[in-house]
């Protein structure tokens, strides 16, 4: 699966524009005063301004598989990295996933992850910078607890998605997709790892390719 565009909402549009352009040094365009488009390698991330809520999301950005330590050093000069109590480190070592990650908050409270996946052939030799943000790699999806299993079955059937082969299904956590792109799915109010921040259901549209077809996933679903 490849995530092409991630459309999100924010109550802090100008602050995010400054953060992603000046702090993370990513290309940011503002097609109008209510929207920004952030170029993340092969993906686009679009924030549209909202005044009715303060949405927040979880997403991960893929980096070269040999650059997690450099990415940590680069980021630590720009943001406060989140500490993982279970690893006693600010680098999470997901042994079963063959991956390592670092996490931080952006100014809107989004939980941002940089992930290096060792089973992808994408090593890089140049010094780490935001030019090595390769794509949006994970998107967190949230469903109501009472519809959790039903909604996952709907995703599997409608978009030809399958369970990530490195993550057995758990009652409160699922991963659909592959190393190139994942939906990480939790029930509403479950804390986003590695924080104590409960997940919420906020509007999003994900444009992605899977098994040779292109899809648009809009959440929450419209009746």
Model-found features: residue ranges?
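Short hydrophobic/aromatic beta-strand element in the GNAT-like acyltransferase core
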Residues: 101-103
């Amino acid at each position: 699966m490849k995530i092409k565009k991630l459309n999100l909402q924010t109550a802090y549009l100008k602050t995010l524009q400054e953060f992603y352009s000046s702090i993370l040094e990513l290309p940011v365009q503002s097609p109008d005063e209510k929207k920004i488009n952030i170029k993340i390698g092969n993906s686009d991330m679009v924030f549209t301004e909202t005044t009715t809520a303060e949405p927040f999301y979880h997403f991960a950005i893929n980096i070269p598989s040999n650059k997690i330590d450099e990415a940590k050093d680069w980021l630590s000069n720009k943001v406060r990295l989140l500490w993982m109590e279970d690893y006693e480190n600010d680098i999470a070592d997901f042994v079963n996933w063959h991956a390592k990650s670092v996490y931080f908050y952006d100014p809107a409270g989004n939980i941002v992850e940089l992930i290096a996946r060792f089973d992808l052939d994408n090593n890089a030799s140049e010094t780490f910078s935001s030019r090595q943000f390769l794509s949006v790699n994970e998107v967190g999806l949230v469903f109501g607890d009472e519809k959790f299993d039903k909604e996952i079955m709907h995703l599997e059937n409608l978009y030809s998605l399958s369970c990530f082969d490195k993550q057995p299904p758990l009652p409160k956590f699922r991963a659909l997709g592959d190393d190139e792109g994942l939906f990480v799915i939790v029930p509403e109010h479950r804390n986003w790892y590695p924080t104590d921040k409960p997940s919420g259901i906020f509007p999003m549209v994900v444009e992605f390719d899977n098994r040779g077809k292109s899809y648009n996933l809009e959440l929450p679903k419209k009746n």
